[in-house]
Amino acid sequence: MALPLSGTRHLTRALLSNVTLMAPPRIPSSVHYGGSRLGCSTRFFSIRCGANRSGSTYSPLNSGSNFSDRPPTEMAPLFPGCDYEHWLIVMDKPGGEGATKQQMIDCYIQTLAKVVGSEEEAKKRIYNVSCERYLGFGCEIDEETSTKLEGLPGVLFVLPDSYVDPENKDYGAELFVNGEIVQRSPERQRRVEPQPQRAQDRPRYNDRTRYSRRRENTR
């Protein structure tokens, strides 16, 4: 069954938290990439569904999907923070090869400024930035404005955002307020950081399987 547009936001963030997007990843047919927007099903392995064809665009306001026909207020209880006013913009090599963190952030600001009118306005609208686990930023804009980001140099994905920490209405990454990075309290920071996989959560083989494999390796 297809997932709602925002349904794979958490899958996307999990993937991004483990991969630095220095080059475009292998993209399945369901993402909006390099200027064409995702359909409404899944992200990365269903990043927002529908087939992605060159030049096609998607809007949750005009999609025929049963999920995307639901207004944001209906989707919010399932994916807190997904209101189509907060967007995650993932970029490829912001600031160029070997850019410093500040150069990346400057690139984020300059990119958003192209659709909101000025760098000062862009600084007000960017609420988080990421320069390590993935390369991109979160910004508060309406859906129509978000479509204008598609196809801009360096923009890989334009994705509806959702909370990493719903209790504090926090979208994760590094907080960005009026052009400056703001530190969270240690407690809040722990809530948005990716948690290391626990040993008991890792897949394990039973003793018979391990014994069988040891025998095969000795042949």
UniProtKB/Swiss-Prot annotation:
Subcellular location: Plastid, Chloroplast
Keywords: Chloroplast, mRNA processing, Plastid, Transit peptide
GO biological process: cytidine to uridine editing; endonucleolytic cleavage of tetracistronic rRNA transcript (SSU-rRNA, LSU-rRNA, 4.5S-rRNA, 5S-rRNA); mitochondrial mRNA modification; mRNA processing; plastid organization
Transit peptide: 1-48
Gene3D superfamilies reported for this sequence: Peptidase S8 propeptide/proteinase inhibitor I9
Region Disordered: start-end pairs: 182-219
GO molecular function, one term: protein dimerization activity
Phenotype upon gene inactivation: Small plants with white leaves that do not contain chlorophyll. Mutant plants are unable to grow autotrophically on soil and flowers are sterile.
Database matches in Pfam families: MORF_dom
Domain of life (superkingdom): Eukaryota
One Gene Ontology cellular component annotation held by this UniProt entry: endoplasmic reticulum
Function text: Involved in plastid rRNA processing and consequently in translation and early chloroplast differentiation. Involved in organellar RNA editing. Required for the processing of multiple editing sites in plastids.
Recorded family membership: Belongs to the MORF family.
Quaternary structure and interacting proteins, as annotated: Homodimer and heterodimer with MORF9. Interacts with protoporphyrinogen oxidase 1 PPOX1. Heterodimers with MORF8/RIP1 and MORF9/RIP9. Interacts with PCMP-A2/PMD1. Interacts with ORRM1. Interacts with ORRM6.
Protein name, UniProt field: Multiple organellar RNA editing factor 2, chloroplastic
Species assigned in the record: Arabidopsis thaliana
Gene that specifies this protein: MORF2
